[in-house]
Curated annotation (Swiss-Prot):
Superkingdom of origin: Bacteria
GO biological process: anaerobic electron transport chain; nitrate assimilation
Upper taxonomic lineage: Bacteria, Pseudomonadati, Pseudomonadota, Gammaproteobacteria, Vibrionales
Residues annotated as binding heme: 119, 122-123
Protein name per UniProt: Cytochrome c-552
Organism of derivation: Vibrio vulnificus (strain YJ016)
Amino acid sequence: MSIKHWMASSVSVTALVMTALLNITAVSAEEKGLVDPRNDAFEQNHPDQYQSWKKTSESVEIEDALAEDPNMVILWAGYGFAKDYNKARGHFYALDDVRQTLRTGGPQDAKSGPMPMACWSCKSPDVARVIDERGEDGYFEGKWARLGAEIANPIGCADCHDTRSEKFKNGEPELALTRPYVERAFQAINKPFEQQSRLDKQASVCAQCHVEYYFTGPTKAVKFPWDMGTGVQQMEEYYDALGFADWTHAVSKAPMLKAQHPGFETWREGIHGKNKVVCVDCHMPKVKKEDGTVYTDHKVGNPFDRFEDTCAQCHTQSKDQLREIVSTRKAQVLNMKLTAEKQIVAAHFEAGAAWKAGATEEEMKPILQDIRHAQWRWDYAIASHGVHMHAPEVALEVLGTAVDRAADARTKLVRLLATKGITEPVQIPDISTKAAAQKALGMDMEKMNAEKQHFLKTVVPDWDKAAAERESKY
């Protein structure tokens, strides 16, 4: 990077910090009766919950999903997930992970970077605070870096609870939806939060983030595509009617959809959801202390880690028996996932070859639609974390339809390529590793990593300093 570029970056960083410092002069959230985003502010009234929440920091390891499955680099060619995709860690690391991922780039001022403000939406209770203070448009408008100094606390208390209520102050949970767009989504499926049962509310607060969503309008605001329902077919029809695409695929030129993490939607269709076994039953069980005190364990994690408090509350099988059942289902889903990936990856490269051979937009349109639908269905299944446990039958069925759609695309491509004089199989480059797949796409990973490291060293410390100054006035 040139000296000139570094100097310009330093000036931009200064401007970004000054913008953040100007925000510090605002009256504190507590004084205005707004959301307090600090998780430790609630330790005194909820000590057990807070201490167990802190234990989500124990999931230290970062698992590189692209290194584990390089096919995904090709499937997301031209989109941020081809740069970097790690498996989720504990809530404690939500801010660290979104700051560090290559997907958010290395912005040097409030107006640069590849992502919108919406990418903070599931990462911090500061989001609820900023929406409270500025309104939804005031939160969503602009680039991700615009309010970086405002988003300072990882996922915690004020994301799921009405921390301003008297009930919460007196030790009760008082669950709440803290994002207005989530309230609208539940109204769209005729399940307004205030009319939901206790069990439904326990699932709905998790659904604020563990769902499919997209960015819409000039501010790139978050919206759930539930207007026609929450099933894979219904959301596909919604997106098609809207003419929406997250991006255009770099190889096939297909108008693609990127499923986020529709865990709530797949859970609803599975055996647990249909029997009202909700998220907290398995991931945040009630536990008893030595003194007899019962509280909800906020160390969100694997149910097998607390088997007696989770699975054993309903199941009569032993831990080993249930683990074997889950392991078998996971292997079945993985096998179908890889089968779908092989077909969709091939379809992308074959579509790319068809374009190079002179195919027209009219000839390609139905093929690209098949590819779009195939990958949407694959992504819907694999992005639903824990789907092999929540709804394995749903995952297998949806992945089966992904294979079918990909086969439809490839059948049409064989015929089209033949009309262009191409009768030999289309060659697929070396994509055996993450690095090889990224190289095949011409991605400059060295540059991206350098930009990210510069951002982490020059911008993030100033964000943290500005946030600490603001919170010192609470």
